[in-house]
Structure formats: structure tokens, C-alpha cells
Amino acid sequence: MNISNIKIMLLGSGELGKEFIIAAQRLGIHTIAVDRYKNAPAMQVAHESYVIDMLNADALEQLILAKNPTYIVPEIEAINTDSLVKLEAHNFNIIPCAKATKLTMDRQGIRALAAQQLNLQTSKFAFANSEQEYLDVIQSIGLPFVIKPVMSSSGKGQSIVKEHNEIKKAWDYAQNGSRGHAKGVIVEQFIDFDYEITLLTVRHKDGTSFCDPIGHIQKDGDYRFSWQPHTMSDTALAKSQGIAKEITDALGGYGVFGVELFIKGDEVFFNEVSPRPHDTGMVTLISQNINEFELHLRAIVGLPIPDIQTLQPSASAAILLEGDTANASICGIDKALADANVDIRIFGKKEIHGKRRMGVVLTKAQNTHIALETSKQALAYIHLTK
């Protein structure tokens, strides 16, 4: 196989895309990073970069036609997926495929596939396109419930409603966190689950492979900590892998899928799936013999996927900083790195207005509990320069 002539265009150039571009660069693959703002993290390591509105069909199609990439790899949801469907019909390679990208960009599409077509176990749910519909569906779902915008990313607009006086506030929060013109929400019965996992699932030319389950803690719908492996029963793991294979087979294409699942005893509930590397999977940068970004690349270009191994119990902690500056300066890294079991990735984001994920702490230890505690200790050292 000659991969030197491959050209990859990344749509969305955040921190996950940066690690993917680095993986491609290491194999001599030409890379193009695209986003709506200049100097995005992945642009800092790509051969070429372009700033466009990826929701603008004309701008997106013109750039793709001009650059003629071998593979088009979406990193975010805020892309004109109708254009990707059109381009795929003209023999462009969309990763994993245009169908998967379009279906997973909104919760209504993917929940319909999972619950109605595949009959996967999910929480009780309903959709609402107006505030009155929202109030109506609450009557059948009951308290407590989770509300999420139909279209959003990184936990924006999500909240758990436990009391009646939180209902109006949660609707407004969902509207403010919704992406684009979509105003619909999904209302889900709150499952009092034991834990939640991400099961990184790799579809490739030789079949489907799984990484060890990743446990994680979320706050306000966004990842804060993750660890691998997460201990679970053989029964729950087998069910999780079965669900992950079923949903990813239905979506199709090659690449890494981040399948989010709720576990209660040996019961497994499908939550969401992303057709790309997952933020909780950043722990694989330290935990696995082949990290999720390298796996995504290998699956896309047709390179072998050997046995995926967890080398040691590991954890990650999102470096979430708060400030208001166009030139962020981060300090405390020297103190955090004094521990030989700690590594750090700083994403290269300069602007911060409010809270923003600026990097990740990676740790390894003899067990995940110690790795997680070590990540929290390292995280405590890191802050913006005052």
C-alpha cells in the first residue's frame, strides 16, 4: 500500500482533530485543516489550513472541489451535511460515510435509528419543538428528566431537571445552547444508572474491534475526567459490545465511533454515538498501544488494526480554565510534570472568554483510582497566568 499520495481534509480543527492530524503527519500523509476561525488547534500542525463557514454549502463545496482530498473527515457536527451527501454521490470519500455524519448530527435521527429501527434499549424519551410541546411531554416522562437540544455539542444546553421550578429555566438553557436554527429538544427519563462508559468501536476492513471500556465523569453535559479500563461484568461488557456493533453496523463506513452507554447492574442502555474519536477517549493517548486517533486513521486508509491493548490503568482530566483574554498564558505545567506518571497536552487555544477546555492531563498508575487521583492533583497546579 502506498499512502504517500493520500490527502486528508479535516472539517473542524479542534483538539481531537489536532491529534488526528499529528497521527496522519507521522505517516507522511498530506493534511488540510478547515474551521470557522483561524489558528484553530489542528491548523497549527496541518500542511494547509482554510477558514470558511462549514454550514455554507457553496463555500464548503467549492473548497472540497478545489482541493480534491482523498478523504473528508468531519471532526464536529456544525457542517452542512446535505453537501456531504451530495459530494459522496460524486465519489468523494466521507468518513465514516455521509449517512452516519448526517444521522448523528441531531439526536432525533440517531434516537429513531437506535430505539425504533434497531430496538435498542434506551431511556424513555420524547421530542418537543415548542415550549408547549415540552410542557406536554414532561407529563408523560415525569421528574426527574434530562433535557438536551436536538442539535448541540460538548454538552451545551443540557441539564437535569429534578424540581418543577427548574422546568422553565431548563427550556431556556436548551434554547441558548442549541446549534443553528434548530429549537427542538429531547426530553429523557433520568436513569439512575450505576455508571456510564464510552466504548470506542473501530470499524475497519477486517471487521470490528473494541477498546477496553472507558469510564467518565461529566458535568453540565461535558467531559471532566475519564479512565481506562472501567471494570464491569462480563455480561454487561458483552451486551455493550453487541449494542455498539449493532449501531455502528447500521451507520456504516470505517473509522472510530464513540458509543456512549449507561449501565445499571447488567442492563445496558444506549445513549449516543459519535462517528469520530471521542473526548473521553483522550485517555488512550497514554493508556493504549494504539490511541484512538491512530486507530481512526488506520481504519480510514486501510492499514491493519492489530490487537488493541490497554498498557496500564490510566486516567485523563480536562484542563478547563476560566478567564477573559485573547492571549491566554497557562502556568503550573512544570509542577504538574514533576510526577513521572503525568503527561500533558496543551491544545494551543489563545482566546478564552468564560470557561474553555485548554488542555488535558494524562496519568498512569497501578490502578485507575490512583491514576484518577493523580490527574486531579496535577490539574490543581494548572491555571491561567494572572
UniProtKB/Swiss-Prot annotation:
For this protein, the Enzyme Commission number is 6.3.1.21
Q: Does the keyword Repeat apply?
A: no
Instruction: Tell me the route in metabolism or biology where this protein functions.
Output: Purine metabolism; IMP biosynthesis via de novo pathway; N(2)-formyl-N(1)-(5-phospho-D-ribosyl)glycinamide from N(1)-(5-phospho-D-ribosyl)glycinamide (formate route): step 1/1
Entry keywords, A to Z? ATP-binding, Ligase, Magnesium, Metal-binding, Nucleotide-binding, Purine biosynthesis
Q: Name one GO biological process term.
A: 'de novo' IMP biosynthetic process
> Which residues does the record give as N(1)-(5-phospho-beta-D-ribosyl)glycinamide binding sites?
15-16, 75, 279, 349, 356-357
PROSITE patterns named among the record's database cross-references: ATP_GRASP
> Which part of the chain is the ATP-grasp domain?
112-301
Q: Which GO terms describe its cellular component?
A: cytosol
PANTHER family in UniProt: FORMATE-DEPENDENT PHOSPHORIBOSYLGLYCINAMIDE FORMYLTRANSFERASE
Q: How does it assemble?
A: Homodimer.
The entry's protein name is Formate-dependent phosphoribosylglycinamide formyltransferase
Record lineage:
Bacteria, Pseudomonadati, Pseudomonadota, Gammaproteobacteria, Thiotrichales
Q: Which gene encodes it?
A: purT
